[in-house]
Amino acid sequence: MKARVPFIVAMLCGLAWAGNLESCASRCHEKFNRDAVCQCDRRCPQHDDCCDDYEHLCTAEEGPPEPEAFLDPEDKIPTSHLYSAPSSCQGRCREAYDKHHPCHCNDRCPEFGNCCEDFDSLCGGDHEGFSHSSDAVTKEELESISETIYRVDTNKAQKEDIVLNSQNRISPSETGNQVDRSPEPLFTYVNEKLFSKPTYAAFINLLNNYQRATGHGEHFSAQQLEEQGVFLREVMKTAVMKELYSFLHHQNRYSSEQEFVDDLKNMWFGLYSRGNDEGDSSGFEHVFSGEVKKGKVTGFHNWIRFYLQEKEGLLDYYSHNYDGPWDSYPDVLAMQFNWDGYYKEVGSVFIGSSPEFEFALYSLCFITRPGKKCHLSLGGYPLAIQTYTWDKTTYGNGKKYIATAYVVSSSQ
């Protein structure tokens, strides 16, 4: 009889455990459990497999949810492109120490005697516009300035300005299926009076200046170059960009507003080659207007561009795999769509933001966290922006162009 006691206890424990797998008691936000009858992870509402008590037990005292991952595989730049010459300081001045590099270009390399041979010629002296190690921007400072930018964006859309019809939401595993699950357009209504505001009008004037196919060189007329200048002048009049400049100036990144504007023009509008032709792409074209490379849509992270192309019948909205937690604009949507015959697997965009808001956040992250995930806070909710540098060619004294910038998950 005694020999059977452990067996009976084990069976009872097993039954108790099986019972737990039908409830979220002590399981809130655990990882996906394939042995469970129902789930309690953060994605279970999306996959419709939550336990019956998930909402009661796991969401009642929950803080602002973090965005789920919505990767954009078409935007990823191979690591080999981040540094074209690790034995040189070309495009690497003031970068963080990396033990994998044979020589270094940070402020302390002279102290340790491990600078690259061209450090003095490329990085020596007082190079304005570069941050020194003592001027490093903290995560808390990024969260604070992003909240400030969010607060002062008076040109953003109001709730009544945009009516969205987001329709079908899919799981991340389905984004590559290329199935149109939404019979209606994404935008039911947009108040186009927004587009008469100076920054919107200047932004829209830039969108028809590009050929979307890579491999075809971009050639700008005098008028088109002036349109770039008008856009920069208009955004710099806004509180959003004034706050950004003030922040970067106090961080010793720029000594004057003109230096800042000149750098913005180079990093965003400077041409480089993604294809076989010289000067067929730029950061602005890729991020805001969108490109087609090897039969797929790349970039295209702007709601105004999306709306205008959808209105013309050139864009077909398929589905979305992420909808942000914000109950006002700007919001974030990660979606799938067909752009006049070419598919975008995951395109994350701010919805209802002003042009200067996006331009400011992407610039902030590129300047302070180039090639990295940049953690921000908007209205109390976390989100992150991923940027990548393009330095097969550089400008100025080895500075890098923007390859891409887009919203990603805030979780690591």
From Swiss-Prot:
EC number: 3.1.-.-, 4.6.1.-
GO CC term, one of those recorded: cytoplasm
Cystines in this chain: 24-28, 24-40, 28-58, 38-40, 38-51, 44-50, 51-58, 89-93, 89-105, 93-123, 103-105, 103-116, 109-115, 116-123
Domain of life of the native organism: Eukaryota
Gene from which the chain derives: Endou
Family statement drawn from the similarity comment of this UniProt entry: Belongs to the ENDOU family.
Record's protein name: Uridylate-specific endoribonuclease
Gene Ontology process terms (BP): female pregnancy; immune response; negative regulation of lipid catabolic process; post-transcriptional gene silencing; proteolysis
Ranges of residues in domain EndoU: 138-411
Major localization class: secreted
Organism: Mus musculus (Mouse)
Known role: Endoribonuclease that cleaves single-stranded RNAs at 5' of uridylates and releases a product with a 2',3'-cyclic phosphate at the 3'-end. The UU and GU sites are more efficiently cleaved than CU and AU sites. Targets mRNAs to regulate their expression.
InterPro entries: ENDOU (IPR039787), EndoU-like (IPR037227), EndoU_C (IPR018998), SMB_chordata (IPR020436), Somatomedin_B-like_dom_sf (IPR036024), Somatomedin_B_dom (IPR001212)
Keywords: Disulfide bond, Endonuclease, Hydrolase, Lyase, Manganese, Metal-binding, Nuclease, Repeat, RNA-binding, Secreted, Signal
